[in-house]
């Protein structure tokens, strides 16, 4: 099952869910990079540098990742309260 709440965890079986809604958690148990389904338009992968579980938002194309351990290149910072991130290519701020 795909968890759509960013306050909940995710089971290892959620590594590549198909019936995803607006967002889905990708667990750290997934090795290397994990591709999200094509329903995200386009499908993207979670980079290894994101050490904690990350939420993949679909508000922008291409999407970026919200994780405290992510570096500054488009990822949300720990102080952010929203998972709606913008990629660097967007004209809006990259976080929240």
Swiss-Prot record:
Sequence repeats: from-to residues: 10-14, 15-19, 24-28, 30-34, 35-39, 45-49, 50-54, 55-59, 60-64, 70-74, 75-79, 80-84, 85-89, 90-94
UniProt keyword terms in alphabetical order: Keratin, Repeat
Transmembrane segments: none
Tissue note: Restricted to a narrow region of the hair fiber cuticle, lying approximately 20 cell layers above the apex of the dermal papilla of the hair root; not detected in any other tissues.
GO cellular component annotations of the record: cytosol; keratin filament
Region 14 X 5 AA approximate repeats, annotated ranges: 10-94
InterPro entries: KAP
Function: In the hair cortex, hair keratin intermediate filaments are embedded in an interfilamentous matrix, consisting of hair keratin-associated proteins (KRTAP), which are essential for the formation of a rigid and resistant hair shaft through their extensive disulfide bond cross-linking with abundant cysteine residues of hair keratins. The matrix proteins include the high-sulfur and high-glycine-tyrosine keratins.
Membership in a protein family: Belongs to the KRTAP type 12 family.
Quaternary state and interactors: Interacts with hair keratins.
Name of the protein: Keratin-associated protein 12-1
Lineage: Eukaryota, Metazoa, Chordata, Craniata, Vertebrata
């Amino acid at each position: 099952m795909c968890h759509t709440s960013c306050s909940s965890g995710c089971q290892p079986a959620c590594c590549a869910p198909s019936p995803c809604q607006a967002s889905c958690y990708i667990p750290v148990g997934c090795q290397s990079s994990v591709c999200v389904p094509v329903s995200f338009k386009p499908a993207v992968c979670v980079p290894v540098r994101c050490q904690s579980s990350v939420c993949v938002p679909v508000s922008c194309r291409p999407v970026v990742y919200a994780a405290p351990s992510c570096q500054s290149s488009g990822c949300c910072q720990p102080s952010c309260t929203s998972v709606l991130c913008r990629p660097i290519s967007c004209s809006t701020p990259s976080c929240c």
